[in-house]
Amino acid sequence: MAAVGAALGPLVTGLYDVQAFKFGDFVLKSGLSSPIYIDLRGIVSRPRLLSQVADTLFQTAQNAGISFDTVCGVPYTALPLATVICSTNQIPMLIRRKETKDYGTKRLVEGTINPGETCLIIEDVVTSGSSVLETAEVLQKEGLKVTDAIVLLDREQGGKDKLQAHGIRLHSVCTLSKMLEILEQQKKIDAETVGRVKRFIQENVFVAANHNGSPLSIKEAPKELSFSARAELPRIHPVASKLLRLMQKKETNLCLSADVSEARELLQLADALGPSICMLKTHVDILNDFTLDVMKELITLAKRHEFLIFEDRKFADIGNTVKKQYEGGVFKIASWADLVNAHVVPGSGVVKGLQEVGLPLHRGCLLIAEMSSTGSLATGDYTRAAVRMAEEHSEFVVGFISGSRVSMKPEFLHLTPGVQLEAGGDNLGQQYNSPQEVIGKRGSDIIIVGRGIISAADCLEAAEMYRKAAWEAYLSRLGV
């Protein structure tokens, strides 16, 4: 039963009011960027709401006529829900651990187990159904029967079909579609938000399979667009399109962070590593011997080896000031850099100032949505604000500096610094992730590598190792 009458509306509204449902741009555990994020963990601090959710789950089980002997909540959010249900209704409860203890009984399931009895599974949110299925398999190994599961919210992304294929009926208090309908009626969200979420759900349905491995007839999620396909999108920025095409041609999504202090070393790195990279990132304000002639030589090398030049200036002032910093001064950045970046702290004026200079020159800008340093404040609302600003200025903004994919729009590029072949960090707060983690799991497009290459005994060999690792991670994401 998908609803429990008049109580559903107030329940959904109550959960929204405590921010259990969040709308914007969020990167899921899978690396997929989603316009909605559901987090019910906070209800444990709100006893009345916790009891209301638990009562609704139990009533849904009663309405469905399910016969069961024990209850088990999927760890961890559903555990307090199962506890309230069992305590209120005097039902024996079982606890499934996520990992076996290495001491004591070393059991995965705690509680009194009577083989042959039926256990009802409780879950907060179901997407693919994998968490419910994992719990069911653990319980079944203990000799228990699992025929049904109750969930507060079904995201309608194939979980119900997957569980059905394994003999488990899923009963939801509410579907995501119904939740959106209620929130729109209550004017909590607008029609555009509803449309975005529904499109995302329709385009990202998990494929279920029968026990014999044959797929069920539900919609398969479309494969991610390749770099070459994204380069041809009608609304793609010309600079982004050019970059994506050369990435595909050269089979590289590696950006070299050439943070060196001598112009000669900068040019030597550009010439030697140019064939392996799609972009070279500069910090011209640390060059001891900067001249515009040096940048002219760099442009020549960029054309010869087909890579773009990205000045990591991190503009962060009012529009009029950044405009002058971009086009004038000693560095005259706009005259030689294909791309620059900016913080969103000053507001949209920073982008407007930059684009007044950059648009006529066919330049592009990256917004800093996340940073790879410990304690960075570029998270949460800040990141979402960066995404909104990019969408509002897509005629100039081509993407983001971020630790993962922060926007669903394939027109935007994601570049991630703080990458090494092995995860780790330094003593100044920099955090490192591997190419497979950044590209394959978090959905970024380009890795930015500096010390991992420049400090290597053989820079070219190191660059090729990073190039291959990042490209293979990209191919694995495509399923190639």
From Swiss-Prot:
Pathway the protein takes part in: Pyrimidine metabolism; UMP biosynthesis via de novo pathway; UMP from orotate: step 1/2; Pyrimidine metabolism; UMP biosynthesis via de novo pathway; UMP from orotate: step 2/2
Location of N-acetylalanine modifications: A2
Region of interest (OMPdecase), residue spans: 221-480
Region described as Domain linker: spans on this chain: 215-220
Enzyme Commission designation: 2.4.2.10, 4.1.1.23
InterPro entries in alphabetical order: Aldolase_TIM (IPR013785), OMPdecase (IPR014732), OMPdecase_AS (IPR018089), OMPdeCOase_dom (IPR001754), OPRT (IPR023031), Or_phspho_trans_dom (IPR004467), PRibTrfase_dom (IPR000836), PRTase-like (IPR029057)
Any one GO molecular-function label of the UniProt entry: orotidine-5'-phosphate decarboxylase activity
UniProtKB keywords: Acetylation, Decarboxylase, Glycosyltransferase, Lyase, Multifunctional enzyme, Phosphoprotein, Pyrimidine biosynthesis, Transferase
Phosphoserine sites (modified residues): S214
Active site: K314 (for ompdecase activity), D317 (for ompdecase activity)
Binding-site positions, UMP: S257, D259, K281, T282, H283, D317, T321, S372, Q430, Q431, Y432, G450, R451
Record Pfam families: OMPdecase, Pribosyltran
Region (OPRTase), start-end ranges: 2-214
Binding residues for orotidine 5'-phosphate: S257, K281, K314, D317, T321, S372, Q430, Q431, Y432, G450, R451
Name recorded for this polypeptide: Uridine 5'-monophosphate synthase
Modified residues (Phosphotyrosine): Y37
Entry function: Bifunctional enzyme catalyzing the last two steps of de novo pyrimidine biosynthesis, orotate phosphoribosyltransferase (OPRT), which converts orotate to orotidine-5'-monophosphate (OMP), and orotidine-5'-monophosphate decarboxylase (ODC), the terminal enzymatic reaction that decarboxylates OMP to uridine monophosphate (UMP).
Record carries keyword Electron transport: no
GO process terms (BP): 'de novo' pyrimidine nucleobase biosynthetic process; 'de novo' UMP biosynthetic process; UMP biosynthetic process
Reaction equations catalysed: orotidine 5'-phosphate + diphosphate = orotate + 5-phospho-alpha-D-ribose 1-diphosphate; orotidine 5'-phosphate + H(+) = UMP + CO2
NCBIfam families listed in its UniProt record: pyrE (TIGR00336), pyrF (TIGR01740)
Gene that produces this protein: UMPS
Protein family (similarity comment): In the N-terminal section; belongs to the purine/pyrimidine phosphoribosyltransferase family. In the C-terminal section; belongs to the OMP decarboxylase family.
Subunit structure: Homodimer; dimerization is required for enzymatic activity.
Superkingdom in the source lineage: Eukaryota
